[in-house]
């Protein structure tokens, strides 16, 4: 499972160097898509297959399910690391996430997240200011 947060720079062609700690995680390719809270999600291909299975199980008769699947799939883009361990982020996804020149690449269970640094700081500050409710953490073992 990938973990940690790494600040990087996006070049003028929309490429970012993948942190060494995450390269093996995505060595077979990855799927980039819109994430929650205005970030991007990057799933390794095997992980994306599991996500697809879960999304395919959502009811087509539910408007909210259809809207979420549309949001998630329509932004998806397949990518691979180049010979310099860079991943190219499509302009549409960079615009969605507010990524210009700087990015935070963060690990999360089963995926990576690409964040605008200001959004990242705000997301972390929000959790510090108002931690998750105890019932959400009932099964968490520290």
Swiss-Prot record:
Stored InterPro entries: MraZ, MraZ_C, MraZ_dom, MraZ_N, MraZ_sf, SpoVT-AbrB_dom, SpoVT-AbrB_sf
Protein's cellular compartments: Cytoplasm, Nucleoid
Gene Ontology biological process terms from the UniProt entry: negative regulation of DNA-templated transcription initiation
Residue ranges constituting the SpoVT-AbrB domain according to the UniProt record: 5-47, 76-119
Record-level Gene Ontology MF annotations: DNA-binding transcription factor activity; transcription cis-regulatory region binding
SUPFAM superfamilies reported for this sequence: AbrB/MazE/MraZ-like (SSF89447)
Keywords recorded for this protein, A-Z: Cytoplasm, DNA-binding, Repeat, Transcription, Transcription regulation
Membrane-spanning intervals of the chain: none
GO cellular component, one term: cytoplasm
Any one Pfam family match given in the protein's UniProt record, by short name: MraZ
Similarity field: Belongs to the MraZ family.
Subunit structure: Forms oligomers.
Name of this protein: Transcriptional regulator MraZ
Organism: Deinococcus radiodurans (strain ATCC 13939 / DSM 20539 / JCM 16871 / CCUG 27074 / LMG 4051 / NBRC 15346 / NCIMB 9279 / VKM B-1422 / R1)
Gene responsible for this protein: mraZ
């Amino acid at each position: 499972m990938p973990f940690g947060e790494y600040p990087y720079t996006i070049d003028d062609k929309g490429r970012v160097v993948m942190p060494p700690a995450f390269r093996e995680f995505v060595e077979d390719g990855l799927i980039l898509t819109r994430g929650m809270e205005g970030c991007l999600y990057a799933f390794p291909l095997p992980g994306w297959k599991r996500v697809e299975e879960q999304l395919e199980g959502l009811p087509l008769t539910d408007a909210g399910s259809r809207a979420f699947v549309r949001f998630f799939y329509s932004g998806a883009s397949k990518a691979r690391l180049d010979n310099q361990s860079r991943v190219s982020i499509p302009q549409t996804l960079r615009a969605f996430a507010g990524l210009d020149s700087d990015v935070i690449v963060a690990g999360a269970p089963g995926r990576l997240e690409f964040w605008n640094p200001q959004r990242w700081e705000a997301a972390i500050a929000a959790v510090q200011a108002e931690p998750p409710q105890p019932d959400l953490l009932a099964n968490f073992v520290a």
